[in-house]
Amino acid sequence: MARPKTIHDFGGFPQELFAQQYPVPGAPLAAKEISASLVQPGSKDPVGLDLTDWGLDHGSWSVLKPMFPAADIPVVQLSMDYERAAQDHFAVGQQLAGLRDHGVLIVGSGNLVHNLRAARFGLQPNQAYDWAIEFDKVVGHQIDSGDLAGLQDFQRLGSLAQQAHPSFEHYLPVLYTAGAATPGEPVRSFNTNFQAASISMRSVVWG
C-alpha cells in the first residue's frame, strides 16, 4: 500500500506506545514484484498480496523507527504463516536473497529468546534466567558457525526451546534473514544483553 498505517497490535503497555506513529511510505509496485517472485514452499502456490487492509504492525515500526526516525524509507512488510515448518520459513528467506542485490534491506524483527510469561521486572530485571542464557548461547553459536540446519531445527532443544519460546513467532524471523544470507559471508552479533530476564536483545547482521 502507498501509505501503510501504524498498527498497535499489543496490550498492557504504557499509553505512550499506543501514541506512536511511523508514517513511512509503502512500496506497492515493489510489493507486487516481490509477491510475484515468491512461491509457498511445498505447494508452490503464489504468495498473497495485501494492498489495502493491514499496514505495519509493531514488529516492523518498533524496530524501524529508531533506525530510520525520519520515516523516509519505503517499507514492505511480509507476514508469516506460523503453522508452517521452520524449514519453510527459511526457504522463503532464500527466495528473498536476490533483493539484497537491488539495495533492499531485509529485516527479521523478533527475539532469539522471548517469554513474556516469565518476564521479571523490578530488582535486577536484566539478570537473565539460566535457560534463557543457554538458548541464546546455542542459537548464537549456530549463527556464528553457519549451522543453518541447527538453526532451523531449534525444536530439537526440547524443553529449552519451549521455555525460550512458548510460541514461535518471535524466533521465526531469524530464519528469513539467515535464509537470505549468502553462505560464508561475514556475520556479527551486537547488543547481546537481556531485558526483563527472559527477552534476548541480541541483534545479528549478515554482510
Where are the model-predicted features located?
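Internal, conserved structured core segments that host functional sites
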Residues: K32-D88
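Generic, ordered loop/turn and secondary-structure boundary motif
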Residues: A2, H8-G11, P25, D57, ...
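Flexible, glycine/proline-enriched loop segments at strand-loop-helix junctions
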Residues: L17-P25, S79-A86, A161
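Intrinsically disordered, low-complexity regions
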Residues: G12-F13, L49, S60, Q94, ...
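Short, structured loop/turn "capping" segments at alpha-beta junctions
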Residues: D45-G48, G103-V107
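A short aromatic-anchored loop/beta-hairpin motif
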Residues: M1-L49
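Surface-exposed, charge/polar-rich loops and edge strands
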Residues: E33-A36, Q40, I73-P74, Y82-R84, ...
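Short, basic/glycine-rich phosphate-binding loops at helix/coil junctions
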Residues: D9-E16, F68-Q77, Q152
